[in-house]
């Protein structure tokens, strides 16, 4: 979402279950509408109200990192909400959409567009060169501060139940996000849309 205002005059609705992350988001983007609820259910109930939808369903049960630690973590089914949202948007949503997630430890059930360490499912073309070499040096000692500095976000006042390193690592590269929105907006502009409502 960061830097999207540079692309177009947009109205954004952000949906986040974590109340304290929602607070941080609202402080950063006071003009956005922030809803504290389950994004998966909200998508089903409100998808038709938007022109563009970006969804990033929870990734831990899909990630290669978790599977690599399978000797020390409990087994868990992959969360199929990811594929529910892809199929739902593909068949029901009339606007442009992006569903983003990490590379899984298995062959994806629905072929994605692979860009760097992320997979994207979209109904429009996205740039091929979204990998940002700056982000490859973030992990390790002091990674939270490096991610936060790159994304210009402050997690120091976060008091919720998630680990800050997990939050920082889950931030989608804002440069990639902006370029994807530019791609969608360019296509939508050609379709004579004057203003976007974004989810």
Q: What residue spans do the PLM features occupy?
A:
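SAM cofactor-binding core of SAM-dependent methyltransferases
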Residues: 1-44, 54
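Class I S-adenosyl-L-methionine
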Residues: 42-52, 59-199
